[in-house]
Amino acid sequence: MQDWDPDLYRQFEAERTRPATDLLAHITITSPQFISDLGCGPGNSTELLHRRFPDAQLVGIDHSQAMLASAQQRLPHCTFIEADIHQWRPSQPQNLIYANASLQWLTDHPHLFPSLLSQLAPRGVLAVQMPDNLDQPSHRAMREVAENGPWQQTLQEAGATRAKVLSANHYYDLLAPHAERVDIWRTTYYHPMPSAQAIVDWLRATGLRPYLAPLTEAMQLAFLQNYLAIIDKAYPARTDGRRLLAFPRLFIVAHAQR
């Protein structure tokens, strides 16, 4: 798959950063020494962490060279490394492992989440936020377009790139035996978008990537045209002309045992 596009991702940075801010607000530790930002992207979440904990040894981790370059330019005094989160092992037990909108791209959560929790220092915190929107009209439309067009065979596996997040009960059962406390909640954000095209532009940077990457440029344009037509109907204009994009997200904050 092609590398991520930081400029496209930042088009809706305020909306993308709001859940990161909400996740950070639920972290109660005061003076963490070691912090890792897993899937740091262009550094918007890392910047929040740096402002909150300026004295911590903070490392941003991502698999995208383009995102890491953007993050390093944004925060030249912070450390960023390229790594696969599945394979990542910190050199020190972490006081805070923070993962905003990244772990939903990874598989094998029953192994991954306990593994991340085991890499915390005593009283450390694992803080996770994941989009939980695969059943939303925006993502159902992706699958519908993929199944109805000349790209059908090419995109047979595109929908499998991102697995549906597990239930809150499942994550609790994975973490609770190894944690002092586990807090889980779900929030649905309603983003007023100026147009149906704006919704498509938002998703081009994230959810649509597995569908567009295997296609030729001409097929990408045709796919997006078909997708826009469905989005236009799925998100009708409200009284002020805007489209309301519902975006549910799952939050998990697990506190390591002492």
UniProtKB/Swiss-Prot annotation:
Keywords annotated in UniProt: Cytoplasm, Methyltransferase, S-adenosyl-L-methionine, Transferase
GO cellular-component term (any): cytoplasm
Catalytic activity annotation: trans-aconitate + S-adenosyl-L-methionine = (E)-3-(methoxycarbonyl)pent-2-enedioate + S-adenosyl-L-homocysteine
GO terms for biological process, alphabetical: methylation
Subcellular location: Cytoplasm
PANTHER family: TRANS-ACONITATE 2-METHYLTRANSFERASE (PTHR43861:SF1), TRANS-ACONITATE 2-METHYLTRANSFERASE-RELATED (PTHR43861)
Name of the featured protein: Trans-aconitate 2-methyltransferase
Primary gene name: tam
